[in-house]
């Protein structure tokens, strides 16, 4: 017995077969301009063959009364398996306070095809006495999305 198949169904199946491989192969790239859920911005330069990168970070929040200044960041991306959604870490050496923040996370392509950086951070502030060590480290999470230019 022969079944007639709808031309529309065949077209749909063919479309899915052609589009699906492209969606799964898209690689999340750290390079570029990013903004997080608090309004902080960072720019990450090109990732070299060893997975190393540099950039700048300008925070939108601070616990100090000092003027916020753009601060350098240095990091690495895991390159062992050339994954499409790589893990990474970077350090920000704040230029306006005696503190350093380390971020670790993963670069994802979300269900809408957008790049997202899901991160966790530790901020270490300087204290004058070891007795104050307990209050010197803070922990948090940030979600970064690619900062779009007006042309996009």
From Swiss-Prot:
Residue ranges of every copy of the Avidin-like domain listed in the record: 26-149
Modified how: N-linked glycan at Asn-41 consists of GlcNAc(beta1-2)Man(alpha1-3)[GlcNAc(beta1-4)][Man(alpha1-?)Man(alpha1-6)] Man(beta1-4)GlcNAc(beta1-4)GlcNAc.
Keywords: Biotin, Disulfide bond, Glycoprotein, Secreted, Signal
InterPro entries reported in the protein's UniProt record: Avidin, Avidin-like_CS, Avidin-like_sf, Avidin/str, Avidin/Streptavidin-rel
Disulfide-linked positions: 28-107
Gene Ontology cellular-component annotations: extracellular region
Residues engaged in binding biotin: 57
Signal sequence bounds: 1-24
Subcellular location: Secreted
Chief location of this protein within or outside the cell: secreted
Subunit structure: Homotetramer.
Task performed by this protein: The biological function of avidin is not known. Forms a strong non-covalent specific complex with biotin (one molecule of biotin per subunit of avidin).
Family: Belongs to the avidin/streptavidin family.
Protein name (Swiss-Prot/TrEMBL): Avidin
């Amino acid at each position: 017995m022969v079944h007639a198949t709808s031309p529309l169904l065949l077209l749909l199946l063919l479309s899915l077969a052609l589009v699906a491989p492209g969606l799964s192969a898209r690689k999340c790239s750290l390079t570029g301009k990013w903004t997080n859920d608090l309004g902080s911005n960072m720019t990450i330069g090109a990732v070299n063959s060893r997975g190393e990168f540099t950039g700048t970070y300008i925070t939108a929040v601070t616990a100090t009364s000092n003027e916020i200044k753009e601060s350098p960041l240095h990091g690495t991306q895991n390159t062992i398996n050339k994954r499409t959604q790589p893990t990474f870490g970077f350090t920000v050496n704040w230029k306006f306070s005696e503190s350093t923040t380390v971020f670790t996370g993963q670069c994802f392509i979300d269900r809408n095809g957008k790049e997202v950086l899901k991160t966790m951070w530790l901020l270490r502030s300087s204290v004058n006495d070891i007795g104050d060590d307990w209050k010197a480290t803070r922990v948090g999470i940030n979600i970064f999305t690619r900062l779009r230019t007006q042309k996009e």
